[in-house]
């Protein structure tokens, strides 16, 4: 019978341990182990959901995930958003190293989970020697006796334990073995397929006093919103590592693809970035109370990390093109009576790297959302920037993954809005002091509610 990838990994791990014991005998470092750790369990008892964000260069299923694997840059970003940070240390199959732990740990305040295939006590001592605060114990590769032996050593070293299960049988064992943090792996460790339903099914069998973490296959904010009703948090690695812009990827996953529109000041852009917006809206429509000039836009967006979106209304295509390309906009949003013919011509004219979005003012029904050349749709109230919502009930049972919801969204209704499963929210008048002047406390309030629920 053909060896599974998990069997190959474990087989290699025995060989690695044998080699490492000769190279670095336990007796040479055991007395130098410090048992003062960052509390992994407490870090996962924060407001839900919690996030264990992972540093992973490679995986057996995907190969090289992140070519530019700069741990210092990754740590700097994860430090802003993670509850704990996972570091892959398996060498052969994940291109990891134990030395990675300290590179990350020295730059963050969170506990570090050493993610490896633990089968021998030597590995735990080694992980702690390299300053890991917690380890992963997989019941798919450990029997009860092995688990008890390894967990005893981890506890003696004040290390946290994430106990991973893959099926009902392993879950029952984890509960019997008194695991206080259980990770449900949505990936089949034998054929590497993903099934997110595993989290929903297995979580219902776990006592309430146990922290539950959903692992593998999480790629969308929508999934996090849904699965958060069953678990305390998520371990996410491959999806984030595959993002070209890691920080944007983290914000999108944890908070949704949210946009703050009607930006007129650089200080408001800084706050939008700080609290987790993905897009920044710059309005060039002459009729808007929040309109800005191209020169003002150039000044305020200098060196920011938002994906900037220019909002236009029935504008000459050449003007749209010139502004969009000179400001290097991520997208142009059409907020007038532009038709499919206009969009087609704009697409032929505009740089291929710049997306085209179409906004619709909603009355009582949803318009056609199948236009050619449109990446996203913005559904707004009849009068944009009026701090009024349209009837959201018409959105029920609709597929809204390429829709951004706008119109009167504020700290009082943002949670209700986020449950509609749009890709994100468009915040404008609901977070202002006056047109174009954003209220920083309101922005903070909205994003905190989108983060913890």
From Swiss-Prot:
Functional pathway: Amino-acid biosynthesis; L-tryptophan biosynthesis; L-tryptophan from chorismate: step 3/5; Amino-acid biosynthesis; L-tryptophan biosynthesis; L-tryptophan from chorismate: step 4/5
Protein name: Tryptophan biosynthesis protein TrpCF
Domain of life: Bacteria
EC numbers for this chain: 4.1.1.48, 5.3.1.24
GO biological processes: L-tryptophan biosynthetic process
Family: In the N-terminal section; belongs to the TrpC family.
Stated role: Bifunctional enzyme that catalyzes two sequential steps of tryptophan biosynthetic pathway. The first reaction is catalyzed by the isomerase, coded by the TrpF domain; the second reaction is catalyzed by the synthase, coded by the TrpC domain.
Organism of this sequence: Buchnera aphidicola subsp. Diuraphis noxia
């Amino acid at each position: 019978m053909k060896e599974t990838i998990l069997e190959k990994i474990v087989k290699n791990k025995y060989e690695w341990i044998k080699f490492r014991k000769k190279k670095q005998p336990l007796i040479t470092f055991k007395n130098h182990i410090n048992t003062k750790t960052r509390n992994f369990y407490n870090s996962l008892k924060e407001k839900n959901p919690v996030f264990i964000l992972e540093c992973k260069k490679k995986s057996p299923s995907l190969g090289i995930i992140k070519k530019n694997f700069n741990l210092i840059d990754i740590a700097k970003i994860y430090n802003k958003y993670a509850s704990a940070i996972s570091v892959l240390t398996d060498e052969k199959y994940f291109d990891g190293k134990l030395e990675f732990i300290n590179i990350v740990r020295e730059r963050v305040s969170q506990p570090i989970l050493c993610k490896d295939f633990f089968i021998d006590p030597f590995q735990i001592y080694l992980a702690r020697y390299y300053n890991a605060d917690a380890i992963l114990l997989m019941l798919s590769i450990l029997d009860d006796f092995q688990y008890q032996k390894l967990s005893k050593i981890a506890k003696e070293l004040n290390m946290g334990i994430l106990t991973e299960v893959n099926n009902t049988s392993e879950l029952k064992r984890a509960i019997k073995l008194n695991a206080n943090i259980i990770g449900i792996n949505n990936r089949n460790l034998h054929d590497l397929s993903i099934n997110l339903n595993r989290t929903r099914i297995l979580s219902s069998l776990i006592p309430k006093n146990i922290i539950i973490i959903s692992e593998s296959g999480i790629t969308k904010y929508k999934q996090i919103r849904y699965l958060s009703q069953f678990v305390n948090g998520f371990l996410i690695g491959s999806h984030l590592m595959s993002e070209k812009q890691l920080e944007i990827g983290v914000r999108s996953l944890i908070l949704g693809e949210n946009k703050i529109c009607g930006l007129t000041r650089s200080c408001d852009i800084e706050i939008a970035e700080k609290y987790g917006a993905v897009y920044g809206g710059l309005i060039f429509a002459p009729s808007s109370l929040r309109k800005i000039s191209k020169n003002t836009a150039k000044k305020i967006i200098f060196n920011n990390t938002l994906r900037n979106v220019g909002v236009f209304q029935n504008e000459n295509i050449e003007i749209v093109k010139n502004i969009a390309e000179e400001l290097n906009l991520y997208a142009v949003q059409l907020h007038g009576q532009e038709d499919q013919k206009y969009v087609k011509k704009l697409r032929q004219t505009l740089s291929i790297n710049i997306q085209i979005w179409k906004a619709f003012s909603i009355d009582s029904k949803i318009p056609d959302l199948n236009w050619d050349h449109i990446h996203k749709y913005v559904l707004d109230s009849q009068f944009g920037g009026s701090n009024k919502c349209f009837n959201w009930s018409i959105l029920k049972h609709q597929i809204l993954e390429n829709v951004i919801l706008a119109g009167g969204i504020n700290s009082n209704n943002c949670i209700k809005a986020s449950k509609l499963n749009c890709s994100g929210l468009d915040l404008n008048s609901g977070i202002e002091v006056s047109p174009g002047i954003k209220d920083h406390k309101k922005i903070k309030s909205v994003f905190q509610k989108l983060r913890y629920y």
